[in-house]
From Swiss-Prot:
This is Transmembrane protein adipocyte-associated 1. One of its GO terms (molecular function) is G protein-coupled receptor activity. Its main location: membrane. Induction: Decreased throughout ischemic hypoxia and reoxygenation. It comes from Rattus norvegicus. Belongs to the UPF0359 family.
Length: 369
């Protein structure tokens, strides 16, 4: 058979294999191509720059943040500030380590573990915001914060372990390039399922105020909470669409998930800061999760008397006697400026016969003697 093929001047082609999107493409080259002759990848540099800038911003705001934290009794703000700080540090560490590792198998595993650690912290903050906002936002106590963090830690750890196991033990061959296995977020199928799940969760949060459920439970009234949920719902929707295209072996989907991955791992921590911490570290700290609109109390009615009546009352006091006038003057200088009108009226009442302020008080002295 082989001789027949050689005689015909042709060779036997191997059977067609499944379409692999690891063929050179701009969206794929971005993930693993190095800058010049260095081992620094464009992808790692793109993720490093926003995290470094945000970390510098946090350091710049650190003196003000420490001063605000000292005078606050809310553990929610302290917890969120620490978590945002940690996420920025982990993002920087992941990018720096990825820049220094080689293309060996051990280095690839280390890089994927750093990706999972970063994802773990980001997901923990995601779940903490949702749980605190919907269930425990009105309980700003250390015990409630610890319970929320414990729940989010367990859930985030389970998610990250599952994703890491799929990524390391069962890497997606469609997300590999040359001799370097690119981090694939657990594979196309896992990426699609998780993106759809989080899209449904955040979409439900956004529409909650429009449902009859708002009459039965207390929902956050801050607009920034729902803007935060809406942004993440949109991000997960785009990520799900990109993953679906990858499952259909359409390489354009890789460009979509590249964009969503960059936005999530670079700007999620700043999103948390702007949505929930900027008001706290501003000039006037605001409540993180408010559950009803604050109604200002009605202004106190002006207790001071009209000017004509006040003049007439003053003349009556002066005619009543010097002692009573002295008491009125004392009242005016001590209390009028402070707005305590009730004490002013008592002290400036006309003096009656037999009162302590009248001239008949001499008989009280005789009795006491």
């Amino acid at each position: 058979m082989a001789s027949l093929q050689e005689a015909n001047g042709s060779t036997a082609w191997p059977p067609p294999t499944a379409s692999n999107i690891s063929e050179p493409h701009q969206c794929l080259l971005l993930l693993y191509e190095d800058i010049g002759s260095s081992r620094v990848r464009y992808w790692d540099l793109l993720l490093l720059i926003p995290n470094v800038l945000f970390f510098i911003f946090l350091l710049w705001k650190l003196p003000l943040a420490r001063a605000k934290i000292r005078v606050t009794s809310s553990p929610i703000f302290i917890t969120f500030y620490i978590l945002v700080f940690v996420v920025a540090l982990v993002g920087i560490a992941r990018a720096v380590v990825s820049m220094t590792v080689s293309a060996s198998d051990a280095a690839t595993v280390a890089d994927k573990i750093l990706w999972e650690i970063t994802r773990f912290f980001l997901l923990a903050i995601e779940l903490s915001v949702i749980i605190l906002g919907l269930a425990f936002g009105h309980l700003e106590s250390k015990s409630s914060i610890k319970r929320v963090l414990a729940i989010t830690t367990v859930l985030s750890l389970a998610y990250s372990v599952t994703q890491g196991t799929l990524e390391i033990l069962y890497p997606d061959s469609h997300l590999s390039a040359e001799d370097f296995n690119i981090y694939g977020h657990g594979g196309r199928q896992f990426w699609l399922v998780s993106s759809c799940f989080f899209f449904l969760v955040y979409s439900l949060v956004v529409i909650l105020p429009k449902t009859p459920l708002k009459e039965r439970v207390s929902l956050p009234s801050r607009r920034s909470f729902y803007v935060y949920a809406g942004i993440l719902a949109t991000l997960n929707l785009l990520q799900g669409l990109g993953s679906a295209l990858l499952c259909a072996n359409i390489i354009v989907g890789l460009c979509c998930v590249d964009a969503t991955t960059f936005l999530y791992f670079s700007f999620f921590a700043p999103l948390i800061y702007v949505a929930f911490l900027r008001g706290f570290f501003g000039s006037e700290p605001k409540i993180l999760f408010s559950y009803k609109c604050q109604v200002d109390e009605a202004e106190e009615p002006d207790m001071h008397l009209p000017q004509p009546y006040a003049v007439a009352r003053r003349e009556g006091i002066e005619s009543a006697g010097p002692a009573c006038a002295s008491a009125a003057n004392y009242s005016s200088t001590q209390f009028d400026s402070a707005g305590v009108a009730y004490l002013d009226d008592i002290a400036s009442m006309p003096c009656h016969t037999g009162s302590i302020n009248s001239t008949d008080s001499e008989r009280w002295k005789a009795i006491n003697a």
